[in-house]
Structures are given as C-alpha cells and as structure tokens.
UniProtKB/Swiss-Prot annotation:
Designated name of the protein: Transmembrane and coiled-coil domain-containing protein 2
Keyword annotations: Coiled coil, Membrane, Transmembrane, Transmembrane helix
Membrane topology: Single-pass membrane protein
Coiled coil (residue ranges): 124-151
PANTHER family associated with the record: TRANSMEMBRANE AND COILED-COIL DOMAIN-CONTAINING PROTEIN 2
Transmembrane segments: 51-71
Organism: Homo sapiens
Amino acid sequence: MSTSSSSSWDNLLESLSLSTVWNWIQASFLGETSAPQQTSLGLLDNLAPAVQIILRISFLILLGIGIYALWKRSIQSIQKTLLFVITLYKLYKKGSHIFEALLANPEGSGLRIQDNNNLFLSLGLQEKILKKLKTVENKMKNLEGIIVAQKPATKRDCSSEPYCSCSDCQSPLSTSGFTSPI
C-alpha cells in the first residue's frame, strides 16, 4: 500500500467517525458548533473517548428502547415519542457538558455560570411552591377546625343497628366497602 492510499483511507475513516457524524448532526439540526478542547490530563485524557462512546451507546440504546416501547403501545403516539427523544437528548447533552467541564477543569470547581443561574431560578421556584403548599396546609387546618366545631358534642348510639350510617361511630362491619372479606 502506498502512503497516499493509506492517508486517504485514514481521511475516509475520520470523516465517517462517530464524533464527526455526531458533530455534523448537532450543527445541522440544532445549530450548535463546539470546537474540541485540547487538554493534557493524563488518565482522564485517555478515558474521555471511551466514556463518550459509552454515553453515546447508552443514549442510542435508551432511544431505541423508548421509541420501540412508545411505538408498540400505539402508532399515534408520535408526540410522546418526540417528547421522549427531546428529553433524552437534553439529558445526554447535560451529561456531556458536565463531562466536558470536568475535562476542562479536573478540580471541578468552576462549572458554568449559566447553570448557577438556572439553579437559583429553580430554587426560587421551589420557594414559591413551598409557600403555596404552606398556604394550602393552613387552609386545610382551618377547615378541619371548622368541621370539628360544627360536629355535635353528643354521639348517637348505633349499637342496635346492623349497619351504621352515621358519621359519629364506626361501622360494625369488619371490612370497608372497597375490600372483600374473602
């Protein structure tokens, strides 16, 4: 083999490699372009391609299983399938960003500021939800107090009735209406 044919094979293999195809898909459909970062981290540098391949393979396996499961359930679930694909891609993308940040900064101290902003936004949203839940809890306690205040102080004697229909005492039945004694 000559060196020109060997280099042309290398060029062909490089153009058909998974990372090149993946970068082309990201650039074509999502308009994202990211230059690969050159680092010299030793062991982490050697493990990075393997971890990325494992991430991609698991992404594709989960994507295949999810699409098959949704398709098997009903052919009309295209919207659910698209939602699943988008969600899975976002999870993959988030994992890739975290891994790239780890490669760029092995100490892990400086993740992106945008993630911190999202963290603060989600914390603010959690605080709002917590306040709403506390308000609902207080209203429920007030309603319980009103109900207890409205109940009569004396209880009826239902021991002579086979089935108790009043709310003041327990039914003599061993089971509720939802379960069977068998």
